[in-house]
Amino acid sequence: MKIKIIVILSFVFIQSCGVFNRIPSSQNNACDILDHRSSWKRAVNYTNKKWGVSPALQLAFIKTESNFRARAKTPRKFFLGILPTGRISSAYGYAQALDGTWDWYKKDSGNRNASRTDFSDSSDFIGWYVDQTNKKIKISKSDVYRQYLAYHQGHAGYKSGRYK
């Protein structure tokens, strides 16, 4: 009897993992996403209060960068078109943050245990990065287009006009 209970509880636990990591089916409707993901709603609202970055901007960045996939990675590079040689970059997670930028965020924000696969941490990262962009490059936090260009290209890439 005890083994049956353990097996059943293990099965329920494993199945529930899939429920919590499932990609939202209606990715083009922010209200639907947040209605079905209360923890995501709390995260984007907290980031809005902390960094002054709108939930709409956060969700737009995450949708564009990872399609709401926690473990999103960049495509592989291939040698001679067939032998995989690594990834295009170290971008990973919801926010597709690069290793160096993520390390900078963890050190600067004090969030040393942050994980790129955690939605709340990714939301906070985006808020922090937009705040950094506002301070360093003077792009308004409400200028979603220019903020995204700076996010995607990096501060140096944006300043050099690499996006043009």
Give residue ranges: language-model regions.
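Sec-dependent signal peptide recognition
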Residues: K2-I8
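A periodicity- and composition-biased signal for non-globular, repetitive helical segments
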Residues: I8-S10, R112
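C-terminal motif of bacterial Sec signal peptides marking the signal peptidase cleavage site
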Residues: F13-S16
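Catalytic glycan-binding domains that act on GlcNAc-containing polysaccharides
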Residues: G18-K164
